[in-house]
């Protein structure tokens, strides 16, 4: 989930680019549902033996009626049934679409590791201030076995869900259906449906599912009651969703495009993200990482309609560190060379992501709502509406500081929340997030992974065979 950079982001009517809206298609045909696991069938065979005389024939006839047949040695054996038997699904097997909770598959809670990368030699004698030293010690203390188990479980949920999603994210599918598949899969695999009070805080979705088309760079999700949006052949779709287990958030994103004309755009962004992951590490300077990302990203160009267009790194979004139950920490990793003295530190968790665009390389707020986030330290003194107080209680008990969407509220059965939400927003208790767009006609791609900076290695926890 992309984080806004302090500079370069353009808001409101004075933005450099004209207003645009997310393209929508109404009443499209629904795609066929994905098939489940194929069940094998075992067929039985019948074997009959005849005797030499009438007595034997009569005996065999009686045996046939009783369901017993003789062997060659004269001993009787039971006749095989013609009934077809279903092959049982073995334990530890996932379904298609994925709906079996991971604790039911990984009984010992030994989830797959991410990609383990050893650190290059570094200077362990670097001096840090006392405050930094205390922060390091706290972070390392928290990076225990439970921490790794939670993170690896969340990462495996992400891998299994996105593997299925990649198979159905084809032209003709509705964005609402794609979001439903992602969210249903995450809830099923974590084993937490998020309906009972507090259940969504134990494990589940870490923020609203992002499904951003073309010039929409980030923060767009289908909302209940809105016009349906259908994926088309010439679309560039960014799929960004997060999974958490006990507040340990895995944030990972990828881009799909059916038209091969955009292959170079996707290649550029994937290469830039992998460069950021390669350079990330303990004591790594963030300005150096940003410069390396930009150099790789902007070495590519895309040919569209016979015109070569350079790929530009977005200047208004950044990667970010992740805290427990908070998708955005205080550190940012821009995609362009920047002046900062910040370094990555031991115990940090980072979402290393990059966005590349064929447009201007800047984003602005678009009309619409992506999601909501609680300002945990905001005063509630001016809150008078009963509906707002009730909604605030629901938000605190079920989402805390996790970002959520209208769809998540309605999944819990919350109704008539619009007036209360407006009151919470006007009192600065809840922040509203809008879609972020580049200029109309441009195309933006995104790739993202979560990396843990462990004491002796970095673990790209969300890495899979796909990206």
From Swiss-Prot:
Task: Tell me yes or no: is Manganese among this UniProt entry's keywords.
Answer: no
Q: Principal localization? A: cytoplasm
Which NCBIfam families does the entry mention? met_pdase_II
**Where does the signal sequence lie?**
none
**EC id:** 3.4.11.18
Q: Which family does it belong to?
A: Belongs to the peptidase M24A family. Methionine aminopeptidase eukaryotic type 2 subfamily.
Per UniProt, the ranges with Basic residues bias are 75-90
Per the entry, the cofactor note is:
Binds 2 divalent metal cations per subunit. Has a high-affinity and a low affinity metal-binding site. The true nature of the physiological cofactor is under debate. The enzyme is active with cobalt, zinc, manganese or divalent iron ions. Most likely, methionine aminopeptidases function as mononuclear Fe(2+)-metalloproteases under physiological conditions, and the catalytically relevant metal-binding site has been assigned to the histidine-containing high-affinity site.
Q: Where in the cell is it found?
A: Cytoplasm
Protein's recorded name: Methionine aminopeptidase 2-1
- GO process terms (BP): proteolysis
> One Pfam family this chain carries?
Peptidase_M24
Which EC class heads this enzyme's classification? hydrolase
Q: Where is the composition biased (Basic and acidic residues)?
A: 1-10
């Amino acid at each position: 989930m992309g984080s806004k950079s302090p500079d370069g982001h353009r808001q409101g009517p004075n933005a450099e680019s004209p207003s645009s809206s997310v393209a929508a298609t109404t009443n499209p045909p629904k795609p066929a549902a994905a098939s489940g696991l194929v069940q094998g069938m075992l067929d039985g065979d019948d074997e009959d033996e005849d005797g030499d005389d009438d007595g034997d024939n009569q005996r065999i006839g009686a045996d046939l009626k009783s369901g017993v047949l003789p062997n060659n040695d004269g001993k009787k054996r039971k006749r095989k049934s013609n009934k077809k038997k279903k092959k049982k699904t073995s334990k530890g097997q996932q379904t298609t679409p994925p709906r079996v909770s991971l604790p039911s598959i990984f009984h010992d809670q030994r989830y797959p590791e991410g990609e383990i990368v050893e650190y290059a030699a570094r200077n362990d004698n670097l001096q840090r201030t006392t405050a930094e030293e205390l922060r390091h010690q706290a972070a390392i203390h928290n990076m225990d076995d439970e921490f790794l188990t939670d993170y690896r479980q969340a990462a495996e949920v992400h891998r299994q869900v996105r593997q299925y999603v990649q198979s159905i994210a084809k032209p003709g599918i509705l964005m609402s259906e794609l979001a439903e598949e992602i969210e249903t899969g995450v809830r099923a695999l974590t084993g937490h449906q998020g309906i009972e009070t507090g259940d969504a805080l134990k494990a589940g979705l870490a923020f609203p599912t992002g499904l951003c088309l073309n010039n929409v760079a980030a923060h767009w999700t289908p909302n209940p009651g809105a016009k349906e949006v259908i994926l088309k052949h010439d679309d560039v779709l960014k799929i960004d969703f997060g999974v958490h287990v006990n507040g340990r958030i895995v944030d990972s994103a990828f881009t799909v495009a059916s038209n091969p004309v955009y292959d170079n755009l996707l290649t550029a962004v994937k290469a830039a993200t992998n460069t950021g992951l390669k350079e990330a590490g303990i004591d790594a300077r963030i300005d150096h990482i940003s410069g390396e990302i930009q150099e790789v990203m902007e070495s590519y160009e895309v040919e569209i309609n016979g015109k070569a267009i350079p790929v530009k790194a977005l200047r208004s979004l950044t990667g970010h560190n992740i805290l427990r139950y908070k998708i955005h920490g205080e550190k940012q990793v821009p995609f362009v060379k920047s002046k900062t003295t910040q370094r990555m530190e031991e115990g940090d968790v980072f979402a290393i992501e990059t966005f590349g665009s064929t447009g201007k390389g800047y984003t602005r707020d678009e009309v619409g709502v992506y999601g909501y986030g609680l300002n945990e330290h905001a005063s509630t003194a001016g809150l008078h509406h009963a509906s707002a107080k009730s909604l605030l209680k629901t938000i605190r008990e079920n989402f805390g500081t996790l970002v959520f969407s209208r769809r998540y509220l309605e999944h819990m059965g919350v109704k008539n929340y619009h007036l209360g939400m407006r009151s919470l927003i006007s009192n600065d208790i809840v922040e509203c997030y809008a879609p972020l767009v580049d200029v109309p006609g441009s195309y933006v791609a995104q790739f993202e992974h979560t990396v843990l900076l462990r004491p002796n290695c970095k673990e790209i926890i969300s890495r899979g065979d796909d990206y």
